[in-house]
Regions:
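Flexible helix-coil transition and linker loops at the boundaries of alpha-helical arrays
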Residues: 1-5, 41-48, 79-83, 121
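TPR/TPR-like (Sel1-like) alpha-helical repeat modules
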Residues: 38, 99-122
Length: 141
């Protein structure tokens, strides 16, 4: 099933604005645009592919705004409700947010899975501490 063309165009417009703002480092403004796009998706939102990438974009904005709890909820939603276990980026951000909210052991597990899926290049734009967490974890076994 496809989205209504008018709804799709609205989602696309807000998403493109959000993406431009995001890449300009204007994360709060990008978050507003992504939320507008997400709000346009009809219920049940889980049936629409656009929900997945918008939740990821919203979670990514929260991450860069250092609102790790809100970001964690977005990526938890992707993992649980949308079954995005096979998405390396989802695993990476989920692991980073778990770490930042104090759940280091579970964070290590998800970061290691992300690493095993995509390798070190997935971590290139991340704080180096996340890659070092995996190194320590690999040594500890």
């Amino acid at each position: 099933m496809d989205l209504d063309p008018d709804i799709y165009e609205g989602i696309k417009e807000y998403s493109e604005k959000g993406e431009t703002l995001f890449y300009d480092g204007r994360f709060s403004e990008a978050l507003r645009e992504y939320n507008k796009a997400y709000d346009m998706i009809p219920e049940p939102k889980q049936q629409w592919e656009a929900s997945v990438w918008l939740i990821a974009a919203i979670g990514d904005c929260h991450f860069w705004l250092k609102d790790y709890a809100a970001s964690l909820e977005c990526f938890r939603k992707l993992m649980v409700e949308y079954e995005e276990y096979g998405n390396p980026f989802t695993r990476l951000r989920y692991g980073e947010c778990l770490y930042e909210t104090g759940n280091e052991q579970l964070a290590k597990e998800h970061l290691l899975v992300a690493y095993s899926m995509e390798g070190e290049e997935l971590f290139e734009e991340c704080d180096k501490k996340y890659l070092s967490i995996i190194s320590i974890f690999k040594l500890q076994g």
